[in-house]
UniProtKB/Swiss-Prot annotation:
Organism annotation: Mus musculus
Name of the gene encoding the protein in the UniProt record: Dennd6b
Official protein name in the record: Protein DENND6B
Biased composition, class Low complexity, residue ranges: 1-10
Residue intervals of the uDENN domain: 43-221
The cDENN domain, residue ranges: 246-373
Length: 585
């Protein structure tokens, strides 16, 4: 059964989103911060239905005072339904990512800094995009004119917790499709009782009579191929459903048809190359795109990516134009029309229908882009790219042996994740070592002078350092590592990595400078200083203190206390009129 596309999505009237909840639970909460806890997890919940006259229609948005622009509503409507080529019968779960438009969102605001400062870079809140997690149902229904019930429940968030939100949808959506609005209102009120996601904490999240236990990853976690085990310290009834990860997908299942090309795909992701993933359905396309963008961890994926993208998207023309080079984006699509539209793209991955048998599916072949001409193009990785590194045959043998021995898929995924993690770390460690060498020595940081500058990153110097401190120290793979680094320097990921590391080093430098000031004899320094110099010191110390207290500087609490004491001491030494200016009542 095809999902038809109408003239365009429009707002359908009525429904839960039409009025604000007035339940007693809602009334009991603080008026100044409505939906504060809910908004720590989700932006809103949307229901998209198919209307014979309107096409895809936004039936409701909840909470009702969350503001979506018309363009965002249109995008959600189209992205919430599989296109007509997918033929998804039954229940389908997938995800999408769309650009935010400007304008005020809601009556509440979530401060991202506290979470982002502690979260792994790859799991920080999206600053400019929404992530949509979709549960779509299409089943025969004789009571409907078209003969089919077609509806999607969409969780809109800025958190990339795909595993958590998919699990949440699998609980909520079937119940919602049966009971509709009252069920959704109750669920949203339950989420509004959840504690905020705090990196490093294990949380128990009650929903519809079930407790989901999750651990929010932290930036200081030891990188492993599998997440830390959950620990339940409370005697919870009912016993919690433990999610081993809020974000990790089943990598082995996602990569099954392309295992022989995992390293080539890893290189393409590392270099930020434009890639189209053409899959038979949005669940396959979105999972594969998310798997590809996650295979660089702990590196943050700095390019654009769209797990599911349609020809109706408001950015369709922008991303498919032939007037300029293809953008650095990974597109997940299901409409074969994209093969013709994106023929000029350098890399196209065509995936066939998934086969869930125990055997390894037929691997897609590497093919030249010139063979990508017809709408019935066969599965394959169409690219003229030649991998810099040799294929790890030992990994493929281990995975194949696991298939033959019917090894659990989560174990297979752990093997694959560890391989990709070690590969990325082997590539990044030399960069980290070289970057660390650019940091000024601590002995050169003196309290009464501006801290020294970080030395510039010189690519030639780095490449020369690889001879004795390169990836060969931690990785057995042979190949043209130098060539890979040279191309990496031109990619968005080098720029993103360098900016982040430089920012962290600059903050560390400033923190060390603050510590040096706090350890100095400030009274001895003030003896021969003018009032202007003393006031200047107060202002600079205050600025550093404000930045440090805003978690922007890595300093200890004792240093902050000492800095405040120094400020008070310095101000106390000034004339009364200046004290009044610096410390107004």
């Amino acid at each position: 059964m095809e999902v038809p596309v109408g003239p365009g999505p429009r707002q359908a009237g009525g429904g839960l989103g039409a009025t604000r909840s007035s339940s007693s639970g809602r009334a009991a909460r603080t008026a100044e911060m409505p939906w504060a806890r809910f908004s720590a997890w989700l932006e809103c919940v949307c229901v998209v239905t198919f209307d014979l006259e309107l096409g895809q229609a936004l039936e409701l948005v909840y909470p009702s005072d969350f503001r979506l622009t018309d363009k965002e509503k249109s995008s959600i409507c189209y992205l919430a339904f599989p296109d007509s080529h997918s033929g998804c019968l039954g229940d389908t779960q997938f995800s999408f990512r769309m650009r935010q438009c400007g304008g005020q969102r809601s009556l509440w605001q979530v401060d991202d800094r506290s979470y982002n400062n502690k979260a792994p870079l790859a799991l920080q809140r999206e600053p400019a995009h929404y992530l949509g997690y979709v549960y779509f149902r299409q089943v025969k229904d004789s009571s409907v004119k078209r003969g089919y019930f077609q509806k999607s429940l969409v969780l809109v968030s800025r958190l990339p917790f795909v595993r958590l939100f998919q699990s949440l949808l699998s609980l909520i959506a079937p119940e919602y499709f049966e009971k509709l609005a009252p069920c959704l209102e109750a669920v949203c009120n339950e989420i509004d009782q959840w504690p905020a996601p705090v990196p490093g904490q294990t949380l128990n999240l009650p929903i519809m009579g079930v407790v989901i236990q999750v651990r929010i990853p932290s930036r200081v976690d030891k990188l492993e191929s599998s997440p830390p085990k959950q620990c339940d310290q409370e005697n919870l009834l009912p016993a919690p459903v433990v999610l081993t990860s809020v974000h990790e997908l089943d990598l082995f299942r996602c990569f099954r048809p392309v295992l022989t090309h995992v390293q080539t795909l890893w290189e393409l992701m590392l270099l930020g190359e434009p890639l189209v993933v053409l899959a038979p359905s949005p669940d396959v396309s979105s999972e594969l795109v998310l798997a590809l963008t996650s295979c660089l961890q702990p590196l943050k994926f700095c390019c654009d990516f769209r797990p599911y993208f349609t020809i109706h998207d408001s950015e369709f023309k922008e991303l498919t134009t032939r007037t300029q080079a293809p953008p650095n984006v990974v597109l997940g699509v299901t409409n074969p029309f994209f093969i013709k539209t994106l023929q000029h793209w350098p890399h196209v991955l065509r995936i066939g229908e998934p086969k869930m048998s125990g055997d390894l599916p037929k691997q897609v072949k590497l093919k030249k882009p010139s063979r990508l001409k017809t709408l019935d193009t066969k599965p394959g990785l169409y690219t003229s790219y030649t991998a810099h590194l040799h294929r790890d045959k030992a990994l493929l043998k281990r995975l194949l042996k696991g298939v033959q021995k019917k090894r659990p898929w989560d174990v297979q995924s752990a093997l694959l994740r560890r391989h990709l993690l070690e590969l990325t770390q082997s590539f990044i460690i030399p960069l980290e070592h070289y970057m660390a060498s650019l940091m000024p020595l601590q002995k050169n940081i003196t309290p009464w002078k501006s801290p020294p500058q970080i030395c510039p990153f010189r690519q030639d110097d780095f490449l020369r350092s690889l001879e004795h401190a390169g990836p060969q120290l931690t990785c057995i793979l042979k190949g043209d590592w130098l060539g890979l680094y040279r191309r990496f320097f031109k990619s968005p990921h080098f720029d993103g990595w360098y900016r982040q590391r430089h920012k962290e080093m600059a903050q560390k430098l400033e923190a060390l400078h603050l510590e040096a000031i706090c350890e100095a004899n400030i009274e001895a320094w003030m003896k021969d200083k003018s009032e202007v110099e003393v006031v200047d010191l107060v202002l600079k110390l205050r600025e550093k203190l404000v930045r440090a207290q805003g978690h922007q500087l890595p300093v200890k609490e004792v240093t902050l206390q000492r800095a405040q004491l120094y400020i008070d001491t310095v101000i106390g030494s000034l004339p009364k009129d200046l004290q009044a200016v610096l410390c107004p009542p």
